[in-house]
Regions:
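N-terminal leader/linker segments that initiate helical-solenoid repeat arrays
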Residues: 20-72
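Terminal, low-structured helical/coil segments at or just beyond the last alpha-helical repeat
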Residues: 25-30, 160-208
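Canonical positions in the second alpha-helix
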Residues: 68-69, 102-103, 137, 144, ...
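Residue-level recognition of tetratricopeptide repeat
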Residues: 46, 85, 119, 159-160
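TPR alpha-solenoid repeat register
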Residues: 79, 113, 147, 153-154, ...
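Structural signature of tandem alpha-helical TPR/SEL1-like repeats
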Residues: 54-65, 90-102, 126-136, 166-169
Length: 208
């Protein structure tokens, strides 16, 4: 499945802000190509946190590795995302949001991070700010799709719309665009399944 969709699929299922697996040396959805050094730091942090997340010292070590990655490459999306996820897991929602906003100061149109930050705002009770972030995410998912025709951007655009408008309107919009988004029946079935998951998941589940 497309890495960009996994980024937000796992996000709205509240498992993590990024794919759980470590990253290979590939460009991210924003087009940034990180140096291999920072990828190694990120992957080390993921490994430490994945295997020893119950240890305060290991959590601290993972955070230190991610901070080093961010210091070396301030545009490295996954390091910010993992740091925000680990802070969230420690109950530090405000710091998690600050981490995503630090990335967005440098990359204000990156929709996957906008969507994640919007969910944090809503979880913290700031629904108005959350809606603004969802809207910005929706607009930029559309922009990215028009640029590279990556189907994942459009599926995630429907997720942003669902958060703003609710499932009924989102379903109607998807049905109107369903055929345009799929080049074949197999792709259409995959899209249908992904969108139905978005539509049928209760909103409160997104905010747990």
């Amino acid at each position: 499945m497309n890495r960009n969709f996994l980024l937000v699929l796992s996000l709205f299922m509240f498992l993590t802000l990024t794919p759980c697996n470590a990253q290979s040396n590939k460009k991210l959805c924003c087009g940034h190509e990180p140096d291999s050094t920072v990828i190694v730091l990120n992957n080390q942090a993921v490994n430490v946190y994945t295997h020893w997340s119950n240890s305060p010292d290991s959590v601290k070590k993972a955070m230190t590795l991610l901070d080093r990655a961010i210091e070396k490459d301030p545009d490295y999306q996954l390091a910010y995302a993992h740091k925000a996820e680990y802070l969230k897991n420690q109950g530090e929602l405000t710091q998690a949001l600050e981490t995503l906003n630090a990335y967005l100061k440098r990359n204000p149109t990156e929709p996957y991070t906008l969507l994640g930050a919007g969910l944090f705002y809503e979880k913290l009770g700031n629904k108005k700010e959350a809606m603004d972030y969802y809207k910005r995410a929706e607009e930029n998912f559309k922009r990215l799709y028009e640029k590279d025709n990556d189907n994942a951007h459009e599926i995630n655009r429907f997720f942003a719309i669902r958060l703003m408008e609710g499932p009924e309107k989102t379903k109607a919009l998807y049905e109107a665009e369903r055929d345009r988004l799929a080049s074949n029946e197999e792709r259409r079935k995959v899209n249908d399944a992904l969108v139905m998951t978005i539509l049928e998941t209760p909103r409160e589940q997104f905010l747990k």
